[in-house]
Amino acid sequence: MQSEQIYIFNPEHDLCIANGDENFVPPRSAMGFAEENIDLSEHLKRPNKQRRQIIPWGWNHSLKKRLANEGIDPATLPSEEELQFIRTHSRREFALDVHSRLSCRDSQVIGPDYRIVATSVSEIEDFISANDSAVLKSPLSGSGKGIRFVREKLSESDEGWCRRTLDKQGSVIVERRFEIMKECAMLFEC
């Protein structure tokens, strides 16, 4: 019996994975686009005449719970270990590690000290002080909510954001700010 593939466009995935709680409810703004373009419940309520392979934009605890509540057999959904693997490998630190292994020429262009993985506010402040400006990135984030641009020093708001991010996610990626020439993004299916 051939399996039916159900693709789920869940653009709120990054916010859900950053939050980590299966009961997290993303902001309405993050959900609107997906809701305008697909009615998931209609696909899931059809008689189960064939096996279904669910292929989301990204797996997270919120989606797993939502699908289980819609009647999908929990045995066909990712395990806790698989979800933790996805969360760990979705962190910016993982991408930085992979990047450092793939590109030896970049260190000649941008220098080995253009970014740090900070675990304290004082590390962040020292980096900004040494570089005049910086981009602060939370290890897990989505929809641009985990990126802040800072010039000269942390504002009260920036410092509060750093403390909350350090408390919840354990680190903040701090990079020298460069002039943006072009922005692009890619999506891979593995």
Residue locations for each model-derived region?
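Conserved N-proximal alpha/beta basic substrate-recognition cap immediately N-terminal to
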Residues: P11, S29-A130, G142
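Phosphate-binding site of ATP-dependent enzymes
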Residues: D132, S157-C190
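Short, surface-exposed loop and linker segments with low hydrophobicity and enrichment for Pro/Ser/Thr
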Residues: M1-Q5, R46-Q53, S129, R163-D167
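Glycine-rich phosphate-binding loop of ATP-grasp-fold ATP-dependent ligases
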Residues: D113-I116, S133-W161, E183-A185
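N-terminal-proximal low-complexity accessory segments that begin disordered
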Residues: Q2-D39
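Conserved glycosyltransferase catalytic-site signature
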Residues: E35-I38, K145, I180-E183
